[in-house]
Amino acid sequence: HEVWDTPPAMPPELTADDVLAALAVSSPFSLYLRSAATLLVRPDEVEADDYVLDMRLFDGYPAKPGFLAPGGIGVLAAVDGELRTRGVWREGVFHEPGSPTFESARRLLLCALNTHLTTLLHNAVMHLGYVTPFSVATTNVLPPDHPLRRLLHPALQTTLVGNYQVAHLQILGSRAFASTVFSHDHATVMAMIDEALASFRVAHFDPDHRTAADGLVDAPVDLPLLRD
């Protein structure tokens, strides 16, 4: 309050009633959008021409006592060039908009998306799994007078200091950010990070590869993040 005297404003894209559909196309969560036809295991309630945000990767990871486990599948249909939420599939039950259980299921799906994007993909995979080894290798392998090492040295040192802080403040230990803010204890967070590092492929960040692999090449909806 001392630094920022006004609360953050809600982006206009997220003021619509169908927040899940807006996030699926106009936020970093669009990274998880895919055609339901690409799912290896597709629940009966999910049609092949649907689009999904599949967070079943959290299945099998127990939540902390008193917490509900994040996860589920956001199911969206293409209608008149836009995505609209059909429901959230969770633990064998399809929760439709307007049903008493839909809001809870949607929140748990959003919790899963947020946990995966921040703790697993951003911090563990990118900061620690990719950027840190690149910085260390560049510093250790190239000679001190190499032009590339000299050019990158200030950025690499800042990267290593920052990622050291990421590891200790956000991931390592039971009092770290990932274990206190989100739904899983430290041991479970470590197990999820191991799986995320083993399964991630950096090629998925290439737009052409990603749209083909996720069945989005001919998607009948506008995908601003991929276009950008």
Located regions from the model:
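Long, compositionally biased charged/polar stretches
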Residues: H1-D228
